[in-house]
Amino acid sequence: VYGVAVDVGSTTIAGYLVDLATGDVVANAGAMNPQIRFGEDLMSRVSYVMMNPGGDDELTSTVRDALDTLIEDLCNDLDTDLLPDDVRMHIHDIVLVGNPVMHHLLLGIDPTPLGAAPFTLTVGEPVDMRAADLDLGLPYARCHVGPCIAGHVGADAASATLNERTHATVEPQLMVDIGTNAEIVLGTAERTYAASSPTGPALEGAQISSGMRATAGAIERIRIDHDTFEPRFKVIGADAWSDEPEFAEQTATLDIAGLCGSAIIEVIGELFLSGLCDHNGVIQ
């Protein structure tokens, strides 16, 4: 018996197939969110809905189709004697999270109230339904869509908060989820604060000469030797680090063109830890 967990992001949709008997993740897959063709960020997609009659239906069907394709990829990646269609029959639960705009579009809810202050949620509570109600080819699965918090702080931040227990600590704890839309949660057992801000353009190319989206060939991990200052890195689409013999073969067909958001954050941290820049970000 399997379950599926999916983070429906503005740029990337990430999914995990879980053995419900053991709790083990047995397959994972990711895909670009095809809604990008309607708008690179959340507000441009909301604008598309406002300016195009039926635009919300287009965006809803697009993300649901992408989600069903991702589930197919998970079934294909599972190491089992079952055929992919048979694996679908053994999936009994699916949990979906995402920012409020993606949450509303996935559920077929008008996102336009989120397009201007006070950024009102039409539905913020958890939603339970049959997976088939979301046009997913999972005939025996129940679907749980996580609760949104408020404004543009969504179910993805709520699930991360529960996992990290930011809301249940004695000492203040800060949880940061940096995607196309960044969400920050600061909390203790007594009180929790949450906020969000668009960050995608800053980490995916805008004003960064070597910035790019998290696609095949993007540098995603960076380490700097604290003694020699020699860097090494990993790219999306290859398992080996740049200083390992297998790297050249694994990246032969990849166009290594820049750094995605995770690499930009890591290189700043590595520069600081190596003493190559100070706490103000000034390179020594």
Regions found by a protein language model. Give the residues of each.
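Non-catalytic terminal/interface segments that mediate subunit docking, oligomerization
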Residues: 2, 12, 16, 280-284
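Gly-rich Lys/Arg/Thr-decorated short loops/hinges at beta-loop-alpha junctions or inter-strand turns
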Residues: 41-56, 136-145, 248
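Nucleotide/phosphate-binding catalytic cleft detector across ATP-hydrolyzing
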Residues: 1-5, 10, 22, 59-88, ...
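Residue-level detector of alpha-helical recognition elements and their boundaries
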Residues: 37-38, 82, 111, 283
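N-terminal leader/propeptide and maturation segments of large enzyme subunits in energy/redox metabolism
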Residues: 53-75, 79, 92, 239-265, ...
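Glycine-rich phosphate-binding loop of actin/hexokinase-like ATP-binding domains
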Residues: 10, 15-17, 23-43, 113-126, ...
